[in-house]
Amino acid sequence: MEQIPFVSSSPNTLGIELELQLIDPAGFDLAAASDELLAQLANHPVADRIKPEITRSMIELNSSVHEHPAGLLAEMREMRDALCEAADAVGVSVSGGGTHPFMRWQERTISDTPRFQYLAEMYGYLARQFTVFGQHIHLGVPSGDAAVRLVHGLSPYVPHFIALSASSPYREGVDTLFSCARLNAVNSFPLAGHLPPEVADWYHFEAHIAQLRASGLAESIKDLYWDIRPKPEFGTVEIRVCDTPLTVERACQLAAFAQALAVLLEREPSPPTQAWLAYRSNHFQACRFGLHGSYVTPGGQRVRLADHLKALFVRLMPVAEELGTTDILQSLRDEMQRGGNDARWLRAQFHRTRELSGTVEAMTQVFRGESAAQRRAPQAARRRIRASSEPLGPMSMWPERLH
């Protein structure tokens, strides 16, 4: 069995990847402009941290390693500003959000790299449908065994990350009725899912990967589209379920939340085996209903996810005080309780404009750090795109059995 070396990292360090949308400011559809944007940035100090993604309407920001979310936020703001300046120069805009509200997958162009071309050939239309946008959070760990323990420890909290970050209610001009529709695209791939519960340490992880390779199911860990996975070459655990938030500020709040949760989990016993029983159901509830979903705890109790999150924030606050991140977690908690998640904000924007193109325009403004109420210079007449179903109202429409 081939060993997989694990590069040791300092515990509790963090970093993020953000997949972002490139927008045509004339009609607010996606723009296939990543090559032009990367060329514009080629001589900029942040150039090595900005990468292409699977289709040319996407771009990815990669942070450095940080000990504190404040340093992460400063770096992400620097990269955002550089990216937006370069985007202005090539005539496009940039936004967050887990999906573009009305793009058509048939119109996407695969990026010209060997891996992306292979994925397009292997997965057909799924590769172009994979024009969705996620945030990946990396947490430093000292060893492979520690990585496996942390993956298992974080797994019951996958719904919390999904609901807090959800920003993909619209897809191809339709209100999907999901808070997070993006993960439905991810789950189409054969190796989506999670680390098997029986993989208890790094030795068993290596054995599992060897089995996948021997049977021709996977060539490398990159082929595993798991919700959370070890990243041995970085020395991290990678949380992959978050939609890209609408702002870099929210992205860094989520990273701070993950950091505090990882520290808390180091001090608690591993979740019981029965915690996996409701994994898929909890996952669906968070995607479909967001913070209003139901949640089955590792102990088997059915509660509202928002209530479980409130209790979790109480447990996290002493850890946040130790880490010096109390203000960041308090802001995330308060924003959750006051305004919900980005999916709710997007639906409110659609209610205001009644056009999805207007919603995308607001997305580009808030990503730049502007108020959604601020208007940029007048643009050319834009394509009128209306959602083909009404946005969700309050979640009193729940089936009774969920209460």
Curated annotation (Swiss-Prot):
Q: Which InterPro entries match?
A: GCL_type2/YbdK_subfam, GCS2, Gln_synth/guanido_kin_cat_dom, YbdK
Q: Does the keyword Lyase apply?
A: no
> Could you tell me the keywords of this UniProt record?
ATP-binding, Ligase, Nucleotide-binding
Molecular function (Gene Ontology), one example:
ATP binding
What transmembrane ranges does the database entry give? none
Q: Which domain of life is it from?
A: Bacteria
Q: Which reaction does it catalyse?
A: L-cysteine + L-glutamate + ATP = gamma-L-glutamyl-L-cysteine + ADP + phosphate + H(+)
Q: What class of enzyme is it?
A: ligase
GO BP, one example? modified amino acid biosynthetic process
**Does the record carry Ligase as a key word?**
yes
Give its E.C. classification number: 6.3.2.2
Give the region (Disordered) as residue ranges.
Answer: 370-403
Q: Which SUPFAM superfamilies match?
A: Glutamine synthetase/guanido kinase
Q: What is the recorded function of this protein according to its Swiss-Prot or TrEMBL entry?
A: ATP-dependent carboxylate-amine ligase which exhibits weak glutamate--cysteine ligase activity.
Give the UniProt family note: Belongs to the glutamate--cysteine ligase type 2 family. YbdK subfamily.
Designated name of the protein:
Putative glutamate--cysteine ligase 2
Organism equals Bordetella avium (strain 197N)
The taxonomic lineage of its organism, from the top, reads:
Bacteria, Pseudomonadati, Pseudomonadota, Betaproteobacteria, Burkholderiales
